[in-house]
Amino acid sequence: MKIRIKIFAARILILALRVGAQSNAYIFNDVDEVINKAIEDKSFPGAVVLVWKDGKTVYEKAFGNFTYDRSSPKVKTTTIYDLASVTKVVATTTAAMICYDRNLFSLDYKVVKYIPEFGVNGKENITIKNLLIHNSGLPAWKKFYERDLNYDDVINEIYSSELEYKTGEKTVYSDLGIITVGKIIEKVTGRSLDKFCEDEIFIPLKMNSTFYNPNDSVKQFCAPTEIDNYWRMKTLQGEVHDETSAMLNGVAGHAGLFSTASDISKLMAMLMNKGELDQKQFIKQSTIELFTKKVSTNSTRAIGWDTKSDSGSSSGTYFSKDSFGHTGYTGTSIWADPVRNLFVVFLTNRLYPTRENIKIQKVRPQLHDAVIKCLERINAK
C-alpha cells in the first residue's frame, strides 16, 4: 500500500511539473511569438532570451539556428555570443565600479593623472567621468582597420586624438573614450583588462563561459557574426567582430567580450541584489546606484550604463524611467528595471550575414513589451 501511495504521489508530482511547464510556456507565448516572427522575417537567424524577476530566472529559451541554413547548429541556451558594446558594461563599467569601490581612482580624477600622453589637443582636463558618460568630446570611433597600424599605433592615435567638440558640451557615444577607461583600469590595477575582469568579476561570479578571445575548442559553440567581405575576408565565428578591438588583440574596453545569457544573468542578479553575492558585498549598493542613474537631463547616459529615453527606447514602453541597460552592435542587449525587480538579457547574431540588416531595432522594444505583458498576466492569476 505504501509503495502504491508513493507511486501515485510521484505521478501527481510529474503531472504537476508538466502542467507547470505548459502553463509557463503559455504565459510566455507572447515572447515566443515575437522572436519566432523575427526569425521568420530574417531579423536574425537565432537568439537566446532570459528573463529574471524577483530573484530568479522565470524564462530562458533558445531560438533558431546559427545561420539561416536550417542544417546549421541549433542555438542553445548555452550558445556563446560576441557581446560587442555590451562589453562596455559587463566588463569595463563593472571593473570601474570595483576600482571606484577600492578607492583606486575617483571619477573626477583627470585622465592625464594616469595617462600623461593623453593631455594634448585640449584634453588636459577630461576626467574619467567624462569618458564614462560620453561627453568628453572625443570622436565616436575611427576606421583604424583601413590603415596598416599595430596595437601601439592605435592606442597612441587615440591618446593624441583631437576633440570634435568642447568637453561637457554634448553627449556623443564614443568607443575611444571607453577604450581609454580600459587602459586606466590596467594602470591602477597593474593587470591587463581581461585578467582583471577574469579575476575580479568572471571567476567570483562563476561566469564560466565569459571571456575575451575564445580558444579554438570553444569557437564552435559561438554564434557566427558577419561574413566579412571587406577586411578579414572570412566568416567571423569566435573572433571579435569589432575591427578596433581586433586590432587591439581582441581585448579592449569597448568590445571583445564573449558570453552567454546565463552568465550575464549572474552579474545582473548581483547588481539587482544591491551588490550582494553569497552574503558578501561584491560591489557597494551606493556605487551601483551612482553608476546606474542618469547623470543629466540633457542625456540618457548614466556612468557607463545607458538609461531609458522618453521615446524610442529599445527597452520598449513599459520599463520604468529608472531602468538601465546597454545594447551591442552584434545584436545583443541587457535591460534592467529596479522598480519591477526585473531584467532581460537578449542575445542575437543579427549581423549574419551582413551588418546592413537593422531589423532588430524594431524587435527589441517589441520583445521587452511582450515580457512585461506576460509578467502582468502571471500577476493577474
Residue ranges of each PLM-predicted region?
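Short, conserved catalytic-motif segment at the N-terminal edge
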Residues: N24-Y81, L104-S106, D153-N156, S161, ...
